[in-house]
């Protein structure tokens, strides 16, 4: 009986609720929210709510109450929160039927991306579809048919209202459009295609809040330099490309601007003999690179947005350049803004770190082991100055010692005492001392010893240079020349008188002419002029 009373009470409709909803024409504010904004975000949940409303057989006031209650419960419990609707694996390529665009589509599919190819006429995309069908994907690219990853989208970039729907939920946009070479006589081509159409795509990507925008322009767009500046003869194409770059820079979305060299003559086999080199902005004004090399570079940029984030890259290919991966080349180019990852990548990184850490018990158990390390790290460690010499690190290693100069008197004292017998004089007393069986002779008074080596050897005499003789024609009979080995030549004047001796010591005047020394030598006589005989 109590259970039945409870059942009857629970199924009854409160009078207050009926009175509050007497105005049937005024809809509930919560129902209006679920009808519009909630339906746009979560159509499945709103459909279930409407089915519950239709299946109810109660009065109109009770229906509104039940619908309001069911909507609240489904929103709180069954609807996940919306974080980011962009597909990180989807890329929109503008100009997909061009030389660079078609190769970019194939390279993106090889890396596992899904591609929305934007073309003005879908009938002209048959060659692109056939080339994609010929691709063979490996396991790293996701496998399956390559054409399943391609979606052709008709879109005229000169009409801004068509671009938003063509982008879809692509997270990356690659713009590879440009004025056609076939329409070289079209004066408005660079302005319409290279600037206005590109600006429309940039504006649509800004509204869609894409994660990455890659734009292909050309060398010499910002700074004048030959031979790149010659392209401005074709209706100022570099000027319009620069205005497109400025529109992308002002949009605020993450960007990468690729400025390739000449791509008209190089074929796809160009990469076999020429390697790609990357330079910073306004560095190169000439060079060539193939369309395939530029397409491969942009596909790698889309795969690694952190390496190409907010960078302006100039690309050419050279035979002398080393073969370097594009990822390593991109790291050498400085970024103009710090890299900010997308919310999806941040959420994935957080979940990956949480899954790798394990249960909370292990974390608590590891805390005590971490604490002592922090304490030891906080203590200041006194740094000891290490000597610069390597000899302090090894005990047995000694620096090479240069021989110290010794006084010449020490060695000469021993040699002289051994070789030349010194006369024994009573004036110089000597004392003999024996120390440990060795007799040493020390003289009380040491005289000055000669530094000349000739004193050590009695037979060794210094060379004597001949002294010049007095320029006299002949000497007197009583004068004899005595040549001593130890000194200069001397004249012996034993029998000469004193006046002659004084006369010999006086210097005599020497004639300046050499002819006085030789009797037979006469100076040459110049011929004297003779008179003519009549």
Swiss-Prot record:
Amino acid composition bias (Pro residues), ranges on this chain: 460-469
Region described as 3 X 22 AA approximate repeats: spans on this chain: 387-532
Keywords linked to the UniProt accession: Chloroplast, Membrane, Plastid, Plastid inner membrane, Protein transport, Repeat, Transit peptide, Transport
Gene3D superfamilies named among the record's database cross-references: NAD(P)-binding Rossmann-like Domain
Keyword match Chloroplast: yes
Transit peptide boundaries: 1-64
GO cellular component entries: chloroplast inner membrane; chloroplast stroma
Provenance organism: Pisum sativum (Garden pea)
Residues the record lists as binding NADP(+): 91-120
UniProt xrefs under InterPro entries: NAD(P)-bd_dom, NAD(P)-bd_dom_sf, TIC62
Sequence repeat residues: 387-408, 450-471, 511-532
Region of interest (Disordered), ranges: 50-83, 334-534
Positions with biased composition (Low complexity): 421-432
Protein name according to UniProt: Protein TIC 62, chloroplastic
Topology in membrane: Peripheral membrane protein
Principal location: plastid
Amino acid composition bias (Basic and acidic residues), ranges on this chain: 495-509
